[in-house]
Amino acid sequence: MANSQPKASQQRQAKVMTAAAGSASRVAVPLLLCALLVPGGAYVLDDSDGLGREFDGIGAVSGGGATSRLLVNYPEPYRSEILDYLFKPNFGASLHILKVEIGGDGQTTDGTEPSHMHYELDENYFRGYEWWLMKEAKKRNPDIILMGLPWSFPGWLGKGFSWPYVNLQLTAYYVVRWILGAKHYHDLDIDYIGIWNERPFDANYIKELRKMLDYQGLQRVRIIASDNLWEPISSSLLLDQELWKVVDVIGAHYPGTYTVWNAKMSGKKLWSSEDFSTINSNVGAGCWSRILNQNYINGNMTSTIAWNLVASYYEELPYGRSGLMTAQEPWSGHYVVASPIWVSAHTTQFTQPGWYYLKTVGHLEKGGSYVALTDGLGNLTIIIETMSHQHSMCIRPYLPYYNVSHQLATFTLKGSLREIQELQVWYTKLGTPQQRLHFKQLDTLWLLDGSGSFTLELEEDEIFTLTTLTTGRKGSYPPPPSSKPFPTNYKDDFNVEYPLFSEAPNFADQTGVFEYYMNNEDREHRFTLRQVLNQRPITWAADASSTISVIGDHHWTNMTVQCDVYIETPRSGGVFIAGRVNKGGILIRSATGVFFWIFANGSYRVTADLGGWITYASGHADVTAKRWYTLTLGIKGYFAFGMLNGTILWKNVRVKYPGHGWAAIGTHTFEFAQFDNFRVEAAR
């Protein structure tokens, strides 16, 4: 092919123009004469009258919950490549902020994340994967800002109530221990700490938290509140001077680019501390592009944080693929660098926390928006977006209709900015597949005639970044392996003496916490997987009454699931294995499938749901606590059978809905139990 440059790229080279004199070989291609007939607007970028608000950075959330669960299982080099796309400066998303869940043992959207203190006298700062993720982010960007926020809390904090504010000092102690543990065990400095995600705040608790932070020498840790709506936190700050003094940032979720009067009057930094939450298609990318600009223009928000960082959880869980990129196949190594990565780069690669917005930002006459930021040292970055309504709808809130049309936009630099003579140009086109182009560097734009003016031809669903910085880069790696379904023959004996992570690969805990465990006296089952909660957490979502961890392929139909099980609780204890489990995450209480239970009282049950409301079969089983048993569950078509220690216990049980789903293990209640030698043979 004589010219391999993408057609869209060729077209865009003709979209940037300047009337400035200069080397003809280095200016952008002039516009066609017919383009002069397109309506246009004039916009001034000026720092003469001072600057706007300080920019605090763009980031993403890991957790809320278990959204990075599968990432840790990826083999190298693919795991490191994914992390580079997220965190490496001037490579991909180049995020400024990483916000993580402070695991509290409860279901928090797509799974549970373990607490550092399951019980009052228990402390372990190596559970889960958020510590690891923060360290990996810091390796790539030592300046990345770290935030922690609880969604759920371990049950012991509630003293019998599902409420974290029963003992304010105890809850503050619990959170501060997490911050201290991050530093002591992982050399991680937490910069911001939150209160309780999307749940009520207690003003006295916030004051107590500040007091305890200061007592522990953590004056540098700032408090963000309340990670919910703008109200009532904003009015509370205005009415309570002591509370106003201890809150550094008002963080709102899914604000729709707008704030409220009380928040503005507070004088506090305003953040969209959780936003996006949209499938990472080009529509999701359009959503992300629009709110990155307009959260500041419309709402004075100086930071926007996406939920979630990377879609590393089974896609059929709630909000599948709602990360900046997708990495949900550690068994194959396949991942997808989705378009929100490159939308992020338009801002993150050319700004830093501590820069300032210009006062002269706003909306374009024919739809779209522009912001400009400076470091005060002569550098300038301008980000322009023209996202159409159709291609930028976020999952929430409702987006009123608006129109974007073809237009010319003339920008004039004034004040100290007029000294700028050249701008690097980066371009993205979203919208239809035939037009898409992600983060393409165009020709340098020269401003040599002293006017400080340039004109852009803008169409729908475009992003331009014009910047004095020359460090931008579209990083890349060779294509990852092809996508493959979860292996249909899978087994895990949990024989890991020194596990790198507390959880077994690919198991996704949906209620309860399942961790590697070592028996000191049982040689045959020395290394096992153990459900470690004996008390219901202070929940954020509707956790099930039974604990459960799912694994495999949601499309599995026929399967044989086998596992050695050990009930630790006499008389009332029970465990199960299951197949065709159809739901998880915040919907786990209503999960259906085929559940094969045995109980320490010498009985068994086969149910159609996790809650045990529909019973297929039941009867006597030679089972007691404190002994190992091998359970086998077979499902084929409309029939199922169950075996205990290799002997048929029940058979020819007719099963109906659902027709497919994951395999699973779990316990009857929040109780200790162990699992070993798990295996599944399945078919899609």
Curated annotation (Swiss-Prot):
Localisation per UniProt entry: Lysosome
Tissue specificity statement from the Swiss-Prot or TrEMBL entry: Detected in brain and kidney.
Catalytic activity: a beta-D-galactosyl-(1<->1')-N-acylsphing-4-enine + H2O = an N-acylsphing-4-enine + D-galactose; a D-galactosylceramide + H2O = an N-acyl-sphingoid base + D-galactose; beta-D-galactosyl-(1<->1)-sphing-4-enine + H2O = sphing-4-enine + D-galactose
Glycosylation sites: N300, N379, N403, N558, N601, N645
GO terms classed as biological process: galactosylceramide catabolic process; myelination
Disulfide topology: C287-C394
GO cellular component: lysosome; membrane; mitochondrion
Catalytic residues in the record: E198 (proton donor/acceptor), E274 (nucleophile)
InterPro entries membership: Aldolase_TIM (IPR013785), GH59_C (IPR049162), GH59_cat (IPR049161), Glyco_hydro_59 (IPR001286), Glyco_hydro_59_dom (IPR035394), Glycoside_hydrolase_SF (IPR017853)
Binding site for substrate: T109, W151, N197, R396
Main location: other
E.C. number: 3.2.1.46
UniProt-recorded Gene Ontology molecular function terms: galactosylceramidase activity
Source taxon at top rank: Eukaryota
This protein's UniProt keywords: Disulfide bond, Glycoprotein, Glycosidase, Hydrolase, Lipid degradation, Lipid metabolism, Lysosome, Signal, Sphingolipid metabolism
Record's signal peptide: 1-42
Function: Hydrolyzes the galactose ester bonds of glycolipids such as galactosylceramide and galactosylsphingosine. Enzyme with very low activity responsible for the lysosomal catabolism of galactosylceramide, a major lipid in myelin, kidney and epithelial cells of small intestine and colon.
Disease named in the record: Defects in Galc are the cause of the 'twitcher' phenotype; an autosomal recessive leukodystrophy similar to the human disease (Krabbe disease). This deficiency results in the insufficient catabolism of several galactolipids that are important in the production of normal myelin.
Family designation: Belongs to the glycosyl hydrolase 59 family.
Name of this protein: Galactocerebrosidase
Organism: Mus musculus (Mouse)
Organismal lineage: Eukaryota, Metazoa, Chordata, Craniata, Vertebrata
